[in-house]
Every structure is written in C-alpha cells, then in structure tokens.
Amino acid sequence: GQDYKGALKDMSECISKQNVNIASVDITVKESVSIAHFIVQVNNNRQLNRLIRKMTKLKNIDYVERAGR
C-alpha cells in the first residue's frame, strides 16, 4: 500500500493481537509504495485466515496473501 507513518507498527500490533509470532519481516519501498513480507508462526489455518482478514482491514493495506505452505 501507499507508504504511511506507523505502517509497520500497525501491522505488528495486528499480528500480535491475534497471538501470532513474527519470525521475520522484510519491507521494501519503491516510489512511495511499501511491500511487506512477514513470516509468521500460526497454529492452524483458521488462525492464519483470521489474521489475513484482520490485516486487510488496516489503513492503506491493499492486498494480503498467503505466500507458501
């Protein structure tokens, strides 16, 4: 999404509120657009799907997807 102050904080808090651990994060910014890749530790698909739904509701988040299995 568009780069905005506090984006990493908002995403990290959202993940934490779902009782999910962040294993790693990689963020790149190109022309005021930020792309964040999180590796998270979840207990099951239900927890992951709930996290994805919550993340998509954050300010200026355009897209959230599961990258791998």
Model-identified regions with their sequence ranges:
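A conserved regulatory-domain signal marking ACT and ACT-like small-molecule sensing domains
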Residues: 1-69
